[in-house]
């Protein structure tokens, strides 16, 4: 079941799990979108947060070459992955469940951009019931140094130093030329993900988990996105962990992180249920 070319993992809740507050026929579905170079096992501890709450969890990480090369060159290579990922919900017949996205770094954020566009434009996918989104260490805006550091982390374990340095230099030059110097022109062909999502009007709540100590994603970019949503009166929460590094907030502060995620999930599902009930049974005066 599902697209065989899509390298995803799905975990269903234990039927005997006690104390679950959810409708047994509509348990929440949490979709984890990993960072560039992330492996499935790295997402396991995040998956456990939601699995222990009785949620269905889907884990997916876009290929690092699509994140760092294709998207940087202006090709919308992740759009098809986004569509296939959303179609999994219909394949597994869980399309009526409340959906929460948990998005990691710019790798997950790029994919999420296309997911949001499809949710607002596709005649079938726009019927999905998204209740909230959590961003971990995202988003960043044309941060060349941070992008080079992220790519270096991926290449360091599998590439010799000479090739790695050449690849990093070529990547930095490409990003500077296409996404900064020529961006006033190229944005009409492919608007960068940060600018596109700054105009996103999605009304479901969003939670931003970030840190001023993050060497890859600038806290200024995250706070600018938060401010943009709040100016539009869109429901937005945030927590600055202060000292944790990139996608390391859970490792440094496991209890606080888990508590924030689970309470946000419950609050989103509750508010969405109330909103749906109100729309189905409007009060007349």
UniProtKB/Swiss-Prot annotation:
GO cellular component: nuclear membrane; nuclear outer membrane
Source organism superkingdom: Eukaryota
Keywords associated with the record: Developmental protein, Membrane, Nucleus, Transmembrane, Transmembrane helix
GO BP of this protein: negative regulation of BMP signaling pathway; negative regulation of ossification; negative regulation of osteoblast differentiation; regulation of nucleocytoplasmic transport
Subcellular location: Nucleus outer membrane
Transmembrane segments: 165-185
InterPro entries, alphabetized: AB_hydrolase_fold, DUF829_TMEM53
Membrane topology qualifier: Single-pass membrane protein
Function as written in the Swiss-Prot or TrEMBL entry: Ensures normal bone formation, through the negative regulation of bone morphogenetic protein (BMP) signaling in osteoblast lineage cells by blocking cytoplasm-nucleus translocation of phosphorylated SMAD proteins.
Family membership: Belongs to the TMEM53 family.
Protein name: Transmembrane protein 53-B
Species classification: Eukaryota, Metazoa, Chordata, Craniata, Vertebrata
Gene name of this polypeptide: tmem53-b
